[in-house]
Amino acid sequence: MVVIVYVIVAYDVNVERVNRVKKFLRRYLNWVQNSLFEGELSSADLEEVKMGLREIINEDEDMVVIYRFRSADAFKREVMGIEKGLGGEEVI
């Protein structure tokens, strides 16, 4: 059985690695804004994302935070201001 989770990935990495992290995450998730991605992943894809990020970042200098939810329905997403990456969301 394939388990699907909804994830939000936020990162603060050295400028030398920002583009590599962004390019890597775009293969799996939707870009929301600078240093923030979200989307649905299988458990296997989530493990691939974590392994790939570990290969890119320097854990002594960088930080990546992964929020994991059972589904996109597990939380409410509200956007204030101009939406950069995803379309069709409610703007408050």
From Swiss-Prot:
Superkingdom as given in the UniProt entry: Archaea
EC number(s) recorded for this UniProt protein: 3.1.-.-
Record's keyword annotation contains Metal-binding: yes
GO biological process: defense response to virus; maintenance of CRISPR repeat elements
UniProt entry tagged with the keyword Magnesium: yes
Classification via InterPro entries: CRISPR_associated_Cas2, Virulence_VapD/CRISPR_Cas2
Gene3D superfamilies associated with the record: 3.30.70.240
Any Pfam family hit: CRISPR_Cas2
Annotated binding of Mg(2+), by residue: D12
Enzyme class: hydrolase
Keywords assigned: Antiviral defense, Endonuclease, Hydrolase, Magnesium, Metal-binding, Nuclease
Cofactor section: Mg(2+)
Molecular function GO terms recorded: metal ion binding; RNA endonuclease activity
Family: Belongs to the CRISPR-associated endoribonuclease Cas2 protein family.
Xref: HAMAP family: Cas2
Oligomer status and interactors: Homodimer, forms a heterotetramer with a Cas1 homodimer.
Function: CRISPR (clustered regularly interspaced short palindromic repeat), is an adaptive immune system that provides protection against mobile genetic elements (viruses, transposable elements and conjugative plasmids). CRISPR clusters contain sequences complementary to antecedent mobile elements and target invading nucleic acids. CRISPR clusters are transcribed and processed into CRISPR RNA (crRNA). Functions as a ssRNA-specific endoribonuclease. Involved in the integration of spacer DNA into the CRISPR cassette.
Name of the protein: CRISPR-associated endoribonuclease Cas2 2
